[in-house]
């Protein structure tokens, strides 16, 4: 298809329009030099502040990770020190304080949630059930929601609040197949037993067995089914 013919008059007119438009822009900048300069400075300041904030957050995150590593070392030492209960308790206390320090430095994102989970683990090891539950609750909406729900279930179970424990175990029991689903089902079954609801406990153990036929818990599950059937 042939292109549209452009007249000589149009060719002569277009440079004039460009020059006129350019002139208007130049005049605007000249007449509004101070506001334009001010707006430019503001934009640069905002960009610089954003870059500095990003750099600072990255530095905070790195510092928190370093503290986390120290805390994890203490936590592992405490977990392996069951032969000396007093020393173990002291180590869990130190680990908890380190994780709290890491969270204070950087409490956002995955790094912050890892700190919270381990703060909860330390409280749990120290039998500080309410504090453990509170820490785990901070992670129910994040990437570690399955860990948090299961851990809250254990916390309420340790307190003897089986209805609340069952509610949190149920989150994982209703989830996708995997380790947390099996743990969730086992937790639900234990809670039904504790609440003297044996038919529901039996049904849950049977469900766990059906969903995880190759689990290393098969012998235990078969025994529980046999026991509850009487």
Language-model segments: residues:
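N-terminal positive-inside, membrane-proximal cytosolic segments immediately preceding the first
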Residues: 2-41
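Short solvent-exposed coil/turn linkers within tandem alpha-helical repeat scaffolds
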Residues: 102-112, 126, 139-147, 174-181, ...
């Amino acid at each position: 298809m042939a292109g549209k013919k452009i007249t000589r008059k149009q060719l002569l007119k277009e440079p004039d329009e460009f020059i006129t438009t350019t002139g208007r822009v130049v005049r605007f900048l000249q007449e509004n030099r101070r506001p334009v300069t001010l707006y430019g400075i503001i934009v640069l300041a905002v960009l610089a502040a954003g870059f500095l904030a990003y750099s600072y957050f990255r530095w905070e995150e790195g510092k928190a990770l370093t503290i986390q590593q120290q805390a994890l070392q203490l936590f592992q030492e405490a977990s392996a020190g069951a032969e000396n209960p007093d020393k173990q308790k002291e180590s869990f206390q130190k680990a908890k304080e380190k994780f709290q320090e890491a969270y204070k430095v950087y409490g956002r994102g995955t790094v912050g949630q890892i700190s919270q989970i381990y703060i909860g683990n330390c409280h749990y090891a120290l039998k500080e059930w309410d504090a453990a539950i509170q820490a785990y609750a901070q992670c129910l909406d994040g990437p570690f929601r399955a860990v948090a729900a299961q851990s809250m279930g254990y916390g309420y179970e340790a307190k003897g609040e089986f209805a609340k424990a069952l509610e949190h175990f149920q989150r994982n029991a209703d989830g996708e197949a995997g380790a947390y689903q099996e743990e969730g089902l086992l937790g639900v079954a234990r809670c039904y037993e504790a609440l003297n609801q044996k038919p529901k406990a039996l049904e849950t153990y049977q469900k766990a067995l059906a969903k995880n036929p190759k689990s290393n818990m098969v012998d235990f599950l078969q025994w529980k089914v046999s026991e509850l059937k009487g």
